[in-house]
């Protein structure tokens, strides 16, 4: 049986490293064709030595020489650098699936190229759908290529919808851990530090998504992602704070029945399901013990966690507004990680950026690129002026 050839965009990040573990556990089924990273050359080189891909790409061209030196004794591995190389590598003939595990707006262009090259997309880069959901879904339909969700919540919804055909969805119940500051007062939130925010209670994630989880912007982005993946309006998507992260999400149908997907918090499960769909494969992991897990659900506090409300506002407005929010969020997230922006200031800067960047109700790809640049500039200026 021919092994599926997989390209992992962002192999040194949290999702990428766990995807490599899945491939290693099922090496009889999957093979790594290509791995990519932005800056982490040492990690990328170590992965290349272990998995022997046909190619590696380092997005930061300044790290190319270092990567070349690290892999000097691996002549069979082709080494490329730059954003253009990312777009080109996903088009390589042997690739069957592309896992988009890179962070941020940078995931949009290679995803578009992969769809046009008729590759199955395993989508972990939520910003792609946040920024350009309509464009991506239209392309996927045009080229008849599936987009398989890797986010645990969207994988859960996808699994709940399996076998339901045209049965009408009444509501999507999107669960959120609530982050580490769920019970904080506004005064406590104002004093939150980077170190506080990077300690997530239930999931092991990269720095950017951990901060987004703490502000609940991550959940806002997942609402937008769900709208596009499942064709459900935002007003039919309800966010439930579920601190245990056992119920990964649920779907309520027109007869009132609710289907939920449960499991221990382990990102290998949704990654593996995207790789193996529609089949399920064994995974060596902890099993869910419902006797030791109480299940609690709460309404999110959108006054304390304003980013969630701003994301709903953006998707209702449509056009390039979600792109504006995403760009501003990338800037404030980095600003917070660099101690240049306070925890509560993040939502203030995003809100002001939303009102200051030109709105376009019918954006093209070029509009998204221009909007992204403008929103980043505006948000950065607001941080510098203490927006």
Describe every region a protein language model picked out.
Residues 1-387:
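Catalytic, metal-anchored helix/loop core of enzyme active sites in primary metabolism
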């Amino acid at each position: 049986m021919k092994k599926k050839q997989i390209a992992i965009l962002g192999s040194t990040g949290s999702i990428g490293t766990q995807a490599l573990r899945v491939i290693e556990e099922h090496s009889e089924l999957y093979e790594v064709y290509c791995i990519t990273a932005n800056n982490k050359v040492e990690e990328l080189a170590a992965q290349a030595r272990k998995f022997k891909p046909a190619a590696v790409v380092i997005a930061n061209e300044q790290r190319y020489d270092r990567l070349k030196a690290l892999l000097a004794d691996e002549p069979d591995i082709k080494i490329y650098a730059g954003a253009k190389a990312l777009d080109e590598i996903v088009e390589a003939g042997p690739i069957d699936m592309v896992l988009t595990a890179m962070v941020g707006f940078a995931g949009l262009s290679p995803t578009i190229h992969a769809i046009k090259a008729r590759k199955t997309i395993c989508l972990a880069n939520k910003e792609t759908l946040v920024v350009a959901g309509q464009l991506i879904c239209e392309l996927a339909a045009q080229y008849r290529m599936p987009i398989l969700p890797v986010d645990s919540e969207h994988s859960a919804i996808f699994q709940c919808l399996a076998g339901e055909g045209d049965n009408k969805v009444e509501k999507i119940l999107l669960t959120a851990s609530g982050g580490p500051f769920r019970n904080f007062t506004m005064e406590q939130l104002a004093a939150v530090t980077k170190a506080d925010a990077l300690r997530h209670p239930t999931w092991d994630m990269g720095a950017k998504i951990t901060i987004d989880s703490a502000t609940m912007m991550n959940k806002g982005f997942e609402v937008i992602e769900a709208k596009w993946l499942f064709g459900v309006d935002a007003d039919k998507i309800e966010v439930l704070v579920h601190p245990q992260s056992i119920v990964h999400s649920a779907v309520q149908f027109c007869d009132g029945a609710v289907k939920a997907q449960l499991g221990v918090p382990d990102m290998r499960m949704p990654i593996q399901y995207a790789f193996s769909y529609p089949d399920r494969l064994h995974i060596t992991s902890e099993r869910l013990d419902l006797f030791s897990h109480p299940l609690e659900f709460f309404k999110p506090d959108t006054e304390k966690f304003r980013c969630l409300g701003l994301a709903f506002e953006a998707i209702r407005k449509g056009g390039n507004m979600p792109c504006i929010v995403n760009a501003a969020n990338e800037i404030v997230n980095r600003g917070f990680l660099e101690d240049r922006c306070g925890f509560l200031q993040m939502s203030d800067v995003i809100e002001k950026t939303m009102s200051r960047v030109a709105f376009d109700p019918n954006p093209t790809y070029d509009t998204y690129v221009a909007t992204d640049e403008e929103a980043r500039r505006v948000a950065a200026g607001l941080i510098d002026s203490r927006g």
